[in-house]
Amino acid sequence: MKKIVLATGNQGKVREMADLLADFGFDVVAQSEFNVSEVAETGTTFIENAIIKARHAAKETGLAAIADDSGLEVDFLQGAPGIYSARYAGEKASDQENLEKLLTAMEGVPEAQRTARFHCVLVLMRHENDPTPIVCHGKWEGRILTQAHGDNGFGYDPIFFVPEDNCASAELEPVRKKQLSHRGKALKQLFATLREQPLV
């Protein structure tokens, strides 16, 4: 199997990607197994940050690398929290603190103006200097609820309303969430690309 490094410290993401990429003959290894140092996400877009993370992991391990950058874009807040979704309430903020800050920012905003979407950009770099990395973008439309619902998922899932299923993202079963979510859509694109252009 061909080793590929996943540029994340999130073990949940590592397990999910390992299962999905095994079908393509990949052995997914977390960057933590190589003691890859943290890299500053200095980009101003999801794409830039995903490329920064993938390039850094490829450089430090000598392997092909996959990175994702994702976040929530709220129209009423001119796109915030955006690339700062994980640290919206501060550098070391918890999911709960980020969620509460967003609910406060959206207090009193009418339902019609609560539109939002999750974005996920996945980047696969064959090596550190790959001039044409594979870039896949998934988007999930919904709106911001006025209070949290459900216990599944993480991040902003409890306050993200999913019109297709008339519930919060945190109320979806994991299999259903994968079908609808921004990350699920980006992964589908990645797999379609890998079928057409297998990594050698």
Swiss-Prot record:
The keyword Transport does not apply. It is an enzyme of class 3 (hydrolase). One of its GO terms (biological process) is nucleotide metabolic process. Keywords: Hydrolase, Magnesium, Metal-binding, Nucleotide metabolism, Nucleotide-binding. GO terms for cellular component: cytosol. Substrate binds at T8, G9, N10, Q11, G12, K13, S70, F154, G155, Y156, D157, K177, H182, R183. It holds the Pfam family Ham1p_like. Its cofactor is Mg(2+). Mg(2+) binds at D69. One of its GO terms (molecular function) is ITP diphosphatase activity. It comes from the Bacteria. Its EC number is 3.6.1.66. Binds 1 Mg(2+) ion per subunit. It catalyses: XTP + H2O = XMP + diphosphate + H(+); dITP + H2O = dIMP + diphosphate + H(+); ITP + H2O = IMP + diphosphate + H(+). CDD domains: HAM1. The active site is at D69 (proton acceptor). Pyrophosphatase that catalyzes the hydrolysis of nucleoside triphosphates to their monophosphate derivatives, with a high preference for the non-canonical purine nucleotides XTP (xanthosine triphosphate), dITP (deoxyinosine triphosphate) and ITP. Seems to function as a house-cleaning enzyme that removes non-canonical purine nucleotides from the nucleotide pool, thus preventing their incorporation into DNA/RNA and avoiding chromosomal lesions. Belongs to the HAM1 NTPase family. Homodimer. PANTHER family: INOSINE TRIPHOSPHATE PYROPHOSPHATASE, INOSINE TRIPHOSPHATE PYROPHOSPHATASE/HAM1 PROTEIN. This is dITP/XTP pyrophosphatase.
